[in-house]
Amino acid sequence: MTAALANRREETFLHLAGELLVPLPEGGLWWPEQRLLVVSDLHLEKGSAYAARGQMLPPYDTGATLAVVERLSAQLMPQTIISLGDSFHDRAAELRLPEAYAERIRALTSAHDWIWVEGNHDPDPPAHLGGRAEKTVRLGPLVFRHEPEGEAGEVSGHLHPVAKVKGRGRNVRRRCFASDGARLVMPALGAFTGGLNVLDEAFGKVFPEGLTAFALGEGKVFVLSGGSLLGDVPRGAQWKL
């Protein structure tokens, strides 16, 4: 265990393409050997995007999301941070971004080698916020991109995975990492982001042999085998109009 993790709670580890990675309960991914922190699908300014269309959500999602990244940055002191696409909710997000939040982003990008991976929501990250843009990042046996393509060693986002299991008296639904040991899909870290159940057919295309879910808990990541997972629609059920 690295010094950066020494003061954290019990850690969960996963292996991907032979590399040891740490899925964090906040939703980030830590690669100790490279001092690399990965976060995905921040969707900054999603609240203001909805407000502009008349759906008045509290305008605090960007601040809450940045606070998580800032906390992980302070705890782990990464050399590099990769924001794995859909960092901003839309192309006009920078026009709605309060200057106080812009300053916090610039503080992060100036303190680290910050890489904005291009997403489907934000192909052109704002240049004035610092960092550098890449479509794909390759580092050792791992490749980082926004949308999964099924390549061995791939770390991607985009699908916003969630796992559902039976709890004590009720079902529990949590954001999660999804992996088969060869490829990994990150959870969405954004405060207002929803999620797609890992039993959805979209994940079957990425993990044809099945997957393990690493569910985010309070201060801990829980490993869930495929047999314990529940779908959002009971098996055999059909939608009725």
What are these regions (language model features)?
Residues 1-241:
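Extended recognition/assembly regions associated with phosphoester-bond processing machinery
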